[in-house]
Each structure stands twice: as structure tokens, then as C-alpha cells.
Amino acid sequence: MHPAPTDTRPRRSSPWLSALLLAILVGAVGGLVAWGLAGVPSGSNTADPGEGADFGPSRIVVDTPQLRAAKDEAGIEPCAPGPGTEPAEDGLPSLVLPCLGGGAGVDVASLRGPMVVNLWAEWCPPCARELPIYADFHDAHGDRVPVLGVNWSDPKPVAAIRMLGEHGATYPQLADTEVALSSPLRVRGMPVLVLIDADGAIAYNRAVEITSLEQLEGLVREHLGVEL
């Protein structure tokens, strides 16, 4: 009695099995992507900046005759350096940012508080919603706690300046065209609120939408010790 011959031909995989494996693979990749996005730390109602910090060399120009005219029309105040002569411990790095709409650049390491710094962008809906609140804070408390805006990697600087004018935000504005603050401030979304104390140290840094003047006043009181 001879044993039954063994079939040595390679078995073909079933089409439905291949499709099932492909679906599992796609689902796993999608899950990892979703997990990564969900793990981004930010405050409520913040806008994702897109591809993160690696934008490559910037081609954004923030000083042209058109931008200077728009800045004058919006009534935006000129940029001014802070009193610091060297970077503060736990403060901003030595980094010169240009003034949005023309004017002298500022080394952010020179900034001393108490000061409110708002990173924002024209493409960010939460930023537009909170701009009037920063404008109100500037009008009410700017003599004691100055407000400084930092326009973050905005491809349309003229639209950004016009948006400031529409919301009455006249406080000085720097421009981070190279997203240079992305790493030191760990920027993961817009808008961002940074509070700087009298020594130049960062007392508060969070991606968060400010929804009321009282909220902003409370944060300044809590983290900078200023009674408003």
C-alpha cells in the first residue's frame, strides 16, 4: 500500500483573507495616527497648526509698504525691546523676532513682566474669537501689565493686520515667521497664552482660548501676583 502523494504546490491565499488582512493593517495605522493626534497637549478649542514645527525656511515677509500702511490704519503700536540685557532663568531664549508690519525687531529674551504674551494666527478661529478680550485687557490694564502679540507663521500677514484692526487690538505685534518659538514653548496648537513675570521667567504657558476678560484677569492674578 502506497502512501497518498503529498501536494507540494504552494497554496494560494484566499482573496477574502487578503482583504481582511489589508483592512486590519489600515485600521491599525489609522488608530496610531488618531492616537498621536489625541495625545497632543493643548487647551480647549485650540487650532492644530498642521505639520508641526518643521516648516522649513520661511518665505513670509512682514515688512512691506502695504503692510506698513495696513499697520498704520489699524493703529497698532510700535514694537519695543524689554529692559533685560541677557536671557532670564526659565525665560524666553535669545531670539530676535521681526515686528509685524515694519519696525525694529525685538530680542524676546529682553522681555520682562508682568507681561501677557499671546501667540495667534489669522487662520485660527479661536484666535479671532479671543482677540477682542486681549484688546479689552490692553485698554484696561496695559499700563500695568503690557500685552504683546506674536503672529505665528502666518502666510497672510496683511490679513492678520486687518484682523487686528477689526477687533481693536492695537498692542504691539511681533512675527514668528520661522516658528522659532515652537520648540522652547512646546507649541502644539493656537492660540497660546504666555505670562512673563518681573524677572523674565515664564510663569504660565498653555495653548488655550481665553473666553472672557475675567478669565484672563484671573490668570494674571494667579500666576503673576498682580491685583487688577
Name these PLM-found stretches:
Residues 84-89, 94-115:
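A short beta-strand-turn-helix
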Residues 1-94:
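N-terminal targeting signals for export/organelle localization
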Residues 128-167, 177-183:
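Structural microenvironment flanking redox-active thiols in thiol-disulfide oxidoreductases
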Residues 76-82, 98-100, 125-128:
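Sequence contexts marking disulfide-bonded cysteines in secreted/extracellular proteins
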